Amino acid sequence: MRSFGRTGGRPLSPRQKTLMAEKLDTYRIAEGDGPLDLCAMFPGKEAFWLEIGFGGAEHMIAQAAQNPDVGIIGCEPFLEGIAKALGGIEETDLNNVRVWPDDARPLIARMPDQCLDRAFVLFPDPWPKRRQHKRRLVQADFLSILHPKMKPGARLRFATDVKSYADEALLTFVSDGRFEWLAASPDDWRCPPQDHVTTRYESKRLGDCKPVWFDFRIR
Ligand SMILES: C[S@@+](CC[C@H](N)C(=O)[O-])C[C@H]1O[C@@H](n2cnc3c(N)ncnc32)[C@H](O)[C@@H]1O
């Protein structure tokens, strides 16, 4: 998928255009086939997190500000989201965020094994119609790409407000066998985790159910 530069929604504002022209090269991860060196990318950081499909970057920027010892890679092909991320990085003066303005999967393939401490898949594109389900990100083949890159004991968070995606994703994670569902009580997946930061998409409440939150520990 060659998706960088996907537009949609509003055109970029003049400030966003300037950010893209002047700052993208500073914070983007370079294209290429070579393996990523996360220690070189984030000097002095010892933990590395990944957010796939950061949308308007609210969650990624807030997590980066709250966790300055962590290096965070965010993936998002949409121009507007990338511009928002660059704005957030600059406004918050962050030194621990890098963006991949494209499909996350080829980037994940370039990561060394067992390098990630956390991953977030928050409100991924719902593809609600049955015939569209095959386009959903969380599928067995995606877990096979992601799992080897996560450290044993690392955490992965998935959230959605689409019931069929919640059911399908939970089944996919649990039946994979390498993702231990951390449901502390029968109901805790109904509440946002304490360290969650509300996203723009989440607050639109476009789905057909209340948001659900699934945290997993990597086996
Ligand atoms: C429904 S939006 C949610 C955005 C954000 N997580 C939020 O909660 O506001 C899903 C986002 O995932 C992005 N996305 C979809 N497939 C992706 C992929 N393979 N790699 C990276 N981002 C992807 C889309 O561009 C979109 O911005």
UniProtKB/Swiss-Prot annotation:
Annotated binding of substrate, by residue: K129, D161, T199, R200, Y201, E202
Function, in words: Catalyzes the formation of N(7)-methylguanine at position 46 (m7G46) in tRNA.
Upper taxonomic lineage: Bacteria, Pseudomonadati, Pseudomonadota, Alphaproteobacteria, Hyphomonadales
Transport found in the keyword field: no
SUPFAM superfamilies: S-adenosyl-L-methionine-dependent methyltransferases
InterPro entries found in the cross-reference section: SAM-dependent_MTases_sf, tRNA_(Gua-N-7)_MeTrfase_Trmb, tRNA_methyltr_TrmB_bact
Pathway(s) served: tRNA modification; N(7)-methylguanine-tRNA biosynthesis
GO CC terms of this entry: tRNA methyltransferase complex
Enzyme class of the recorded protein, top EC level: transferase
Binding residues annotated for S-adenosyl-L-methionine, in chain numbering: E51, E76, D103, D125
Domain of life of the source: Bacteria
PANTHER family: 3-DEOXY-D-MANNO-OCTULOSONIC-ACID TRANSFERASE/TRNA GUANINE-N 7 - -METHYLTRANSFERASE, PENTACOTRIPEPTIDE-REPEAT REGION OF PRORP DOMAIN-CONTAINING PROTEIN
Native species: Hyphomonas neptunium (strain ATCC 15444)
Keyword flag tRNA processing: yes
Catalytic activity, as annotated: guanosine(46) in tRNA + S-adenosyl-L-methionine = N(7)-methylguanosine(46) in tRNA + S-adenosyl-L-homocysteine
Protein name as it appears in the record: tRNA (guanine-N(7)-)-methyltransferase
